Amino acid sequence: MCSKRFCTLILLGVMVIVSSMSAWSLRLEKIKYGDFSNWVTRSITESSVLGGKTKKVYEIAPTQSIVGNKPYRNQGGSPWATSNVYAKVVGIVKASNTVSPFDRGGGNKCVKMSAMMEEVKVLGVINMDVMVQGTIFLGQINEPITSTKTPYSKMEMGIPYTKRPVALVFDYKVDMPATNTRIKSTGFGTPKTLQGRDCAEVYCLLQRRWEDKDGNIYAKRVGTGRERYYKSTGWINGHELRIHYGDITSKPFYKSWMGLLTGDKAPYAKNSRGKMVPVNEVGWDAPNATPTHVMVMASCASGVPFVGTEGLTLYFDNVAFGF
């Protein structure tokens, strides 16, 4: 019979092995273009009153170049949208790029999302800064953007999906600036410095959606996986974001920001009439419910428009559902 100390060491060794193998034990279903090896490069020329520069703006889809100020729709069956946008407000064209390809080494690309101040100058008359944050998600952006009001209403979030994965699996890395502040800057008024740094975030939310006779869309939350990252890391490969089914509000890991999305936090989707409407979550679904849609999002910010920690960067790669 082994000694108590020896048995304990063996047990610990087995636990370490099992823990290190957990990502490999899942069957992975890759999300299309989720290795971020393919990118569309758009060349958008801003209005002459803004200087008339041509900016590079990137999208996640089969490799190609698009020249000209053209609204973008997802190409080649790509399910990914980005916070990179072509805006045309009262006839003035502006481009913004906070999401771009990044070489991990040897030509192995990932996606890089950064928080930065976007400068807007109009012939020396207007000089303002807007805090913009890099974000990618499953869905569509409706271009051109014509106003800064209700940002979520420009984002068609979520795609049809009926499976029940146990995890979202991905590689990630965080660069967190050595500061404990955030900047709020909408472009109107003086930028404000807020105490407390922002954080990067990844979520995978499963919903069961339906539409009423008036075209309103509602949902119940089927599954929840949501994490926030508050400090710098090296590359963490094969990370598992576990998805928990049913009502999680009584679970020890539950945080308020994992809650239901309603009101100004509600995502938007097109209803059967082609109108963008909010998708209000009205409750938690049964633990064995089948979803109709999945929302996957990764961002270098925690979801408040025009608020961020400048320089905070999230790198993201090799995204898959784990079963």
How does the language model describe each region?
Residues 186-192:
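Short, conserved, GDST-rich strand-edge loop motifs in beta-rich repeat architectures
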Residues 180, 249-257:
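Substrate-binding/catalytic groove segments of enzymes
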Residues 26-165, 195-246, 257-322:
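Aromatic (Trp/Tyr/Phe) and Gly/Pro-enriched flexible surface segments
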Residues 174-181, 192-197:
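Extended, low-complexity, turn-rich repeat/linker tracts enriched in Gly/Pro/Ser/Thr and Asp/Glu
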Residues 1-30:
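Bacterial Sec-dependent N-terminal signal peptides
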Residues 180-185, 214-217:
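A short secondary-structure junction signal
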Residues 164-174:
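A short beta-strand element within beta-rich, extracytoplasmic domains
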Residues 15-19, 133, 172:
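N-terminal non-cleavable signal-anchor helices
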